[in-house]
């Protein structure tokens, strides 16, 4: 899907796609093509250094100095989605993915619990997919052991794309929300509030 979003900008260029779970093959292909003297761009969503392919490229290249690798910073969903809702991440926050394909669910549970106990605002990536439709509900069950049902949250879908939508709701409502892999979920901290329709987490400036 990421190549489909950009292919019209680069007419005449060779495009290569690999399916999900083939990330190693995708990165290795990029390195092999670069070693042939080609200029290669490995396309990721958001920022390639945040749940992207940047680290994997460095791992596969190993201690070799060739080919040269340049990581171009992008705009991750925590930032772009937060801007759609307002400013929910203005203070300390955690970013947690609910995908257990590469991370054990027990580790994800622990990270959710620690973030809630630390009163962090939380940006949640990969809240659901066809293979794990109940992961957000399970995550909410964990958060609700620490946080109140009325804790403010937000959902943004298709950030920056056609059909973008957003919603502000409570943690209790989030538990039953309809989400998919195109959604990013935000859970506020104890100071998060709604001001004129915007979800914000104050930094703590005095006299405001």
Predicted segments, located by residue:
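Short, well-ordered secondary-structure micro-motifs
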Residues: 28, 53-54, 81-83, 106-108, ...
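Class I SAM-dependent methyltransferase SAM-binding "motif I" and its flanking Rossmann-like core
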Residues: 50-118
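Class I S-adenosyl-L-methionine
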Residues: 1-69, 80, 175
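A contiguous loop/helix-start segment that scaffolds small-molecule binding in enzyme catalytic cores
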Residues: 39-40, 117-208
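Glycine-/small-residue-rich active-site loops that bind phosphorylated ligands and cofactors
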Residues: 22, 48-49, 100-103, 128-131
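General beta-strand structural signal in soluble alpha/beta enzymes
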Residues: 17, 42-44, 69-74, 89-91, ...
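A generic local secondary-structure boundary/capping motif
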Residues: 31, 69, 84-85, 109-113, ...
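Short, acidic/turn-prone active-site loops that include or flank metal/cofactor-
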Residues: 1-3, 17-25, 75, 95-102, ...
């Amino acid at each position: 899907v990421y190549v489909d979003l950009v292919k019209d900008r680069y007419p005449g260029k060779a495009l290569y796609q690999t399916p999900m779970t083939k990330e190693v093959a995708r990165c290795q292909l990029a390195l092999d093509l670069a070693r042939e003297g080609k200029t290669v761009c490995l396309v990721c969503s958001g920022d390639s250094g945040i749940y992207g392919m940047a680290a994997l490229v460095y791992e596969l290249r190993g201690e070799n100095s060739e080919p040269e690798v340049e990581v171009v910073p992008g705009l991750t969903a925590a930032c772009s989605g937060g801007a759609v809702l307002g400013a929910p991440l203005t203070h300390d926050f955690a970013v947690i993915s609910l995908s257990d394909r590469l991370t054990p669910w027990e580790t994800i549970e622990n990270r959710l619990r620690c973030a809630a106990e630390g009163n962090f605002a939380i940006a949640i990536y990969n809240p659901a997919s066809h293979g794990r439709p109940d992961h957000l509900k399970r995550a909410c069950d964990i958060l609700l052991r620490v946080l109140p049902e009325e804790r403010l949250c937000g959902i943004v879908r298709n950030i920056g794309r056609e059909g973008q939508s957003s919603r502000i709701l409570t943690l209790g409502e989030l538990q039953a929300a309809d989400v998919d892999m195109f959604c990013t979920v935000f859970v506020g901290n104890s100071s998060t509030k709604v001001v004129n329709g915007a979800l914000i987490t104050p930094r703590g400036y005095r006299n405001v």
